């Protein structure tokens, strides 16, 4: 883990130096490639205090304008059908989570540049108005609490605003918890959440409603896919619960969209063979990951890994890394 992080930081530093030395054209030289991009949230300023999942509206528009001008940006369906162009970067765009800010900021920009995208929705609406990950990120940052107890374990707040027990963050522990236990986190931080001015923070947790999801599903540029029901790590909860989460999200979205939902993105990118084959059984034709578990998995045409957007680097660096297909490699 430490070696991977070091290579990542070294790779970005290397590109930064090259840009400053005037080698930007070399770094941005077009080349053949195939990448599905993964965005999460878009906000007004690119806030990273709460998480590493949001980029600013200005960054997003600059990025979309650049890639739509210089490369071949295609729909996810066309990407799966390998409708690629030679000697250029071929890109499909996806969003995970179902944030309202996608509807507010991303959709108008994508429409402006006529860029297709797929939105993967977490159907938690019947249980909570937010994803537990966002709730925990925001209250952990703002709470005055320094210690809390969850499942008889004592967590201490560190300088990074994370609650830690036994060198493990509460967020990592929570990924594997059943939802009824996750609801205990809501109760622990209930007063902290209610003390937050909602308008100031709503961009970081509010989700699209059914009408907005349906509007995107009906748009000729866009498609809707499923992303689970509660954003649990499906490989860490009991297998039958995981399957029910997948099925529920499909049924709920098909009810909203009035059309088949055939795309599924695994929360956190975590998957296993049994869950992947279950997705196929119930009608999902395209499965989106982050990284493949094995080299053999990369040979499955229905499974695709994705290139996660980095909110900490410039647009030029992001494009350079995308062209190279890595955050750690040089030119």
Regions picked out by a protein language model, each given a short descriptive name:
Residues 109-112, 281-282:
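Glycine-rich, phosphate-binding/catalytic loops in enzymes
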Residues 108, 214, 276-277:
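Alpha-helical segments flanking ligand/cofactor-binding loops in enzyme cores
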Residues 97-104, 109:
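Short acidic, Gly/Ser-rich segments with clustered Asp/Glu that frequently serve as metal-coordination loops
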Residues 1-94, 101, 139, 218-219, ...:
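C-terminal active-site subregion of NodB/CE4 polysaccharide deacetylases
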């Amino acid at each position: 883990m430490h070696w991977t992080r070091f290579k990542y930081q070294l790779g970005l530093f290397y590109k930064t130096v090259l840009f400053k030395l005037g080698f930007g054209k070399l770094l941005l030289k077009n080349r053949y490639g195939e990448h599905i991009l993964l965005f999460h949230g878009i906000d007004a300023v690119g806030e990273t205090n709460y998480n590493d999942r949001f980029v600013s509206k200005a960054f997003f528009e600059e990025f979309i304008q650049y890639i739509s001008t210089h490369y071949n940006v295609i729909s996810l369906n066309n990407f799966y059908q390998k409708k690629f162009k030679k000697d250029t970067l071929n890109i499909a765009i996806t969003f995970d989570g179902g944030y309202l800010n996608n509807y507010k900021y991303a959709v108008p920009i994508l429409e402006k540049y006529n860029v297709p995208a797929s939105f993967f929705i977490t159907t938690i609406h019947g249980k909570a108005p937010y994803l537990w990950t966002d709730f925990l990120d925001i209250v952990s940052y703002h709470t005055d609490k320094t210690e809390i107890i969850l499942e008889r374990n004592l967590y201490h707040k560190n300088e990074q605003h994370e609650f830690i027990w036994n060198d493990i963050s509460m967020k990592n522990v929570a990924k594997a918890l059943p939802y009824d236990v996750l609801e205990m986190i809501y109760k622990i931080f209930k007063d902290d959440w209610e003390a937050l001015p909602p308008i100031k923070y709503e961009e970081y947790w509010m989700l699209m409603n059914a009408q907005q999801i349906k509007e995107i599903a009906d748009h000729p540029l866009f498609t809707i896919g499923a992303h689970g029901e509660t954003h649990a790590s499906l490989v860490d909860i009991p297998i039958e619960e995981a399957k029910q989460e997948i099925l529920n999200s499909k049924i709920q979205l098909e009810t909203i969209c009035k059309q088949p939902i055939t795309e599924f993105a695994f929360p956190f990118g975590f998957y296993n063979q049994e869950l992947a084959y279950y997705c196929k059984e119930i009608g999902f034709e395209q499965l989106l990951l982050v990284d493949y578990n094995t080299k053999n998995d990369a040979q499955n045409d229905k499974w695709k890994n994705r290139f996660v957007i980095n909110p900490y680097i410039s647009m030029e660096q992001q494009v350079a890394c995308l062209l190279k297909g890595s955050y750690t490699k040089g030119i």
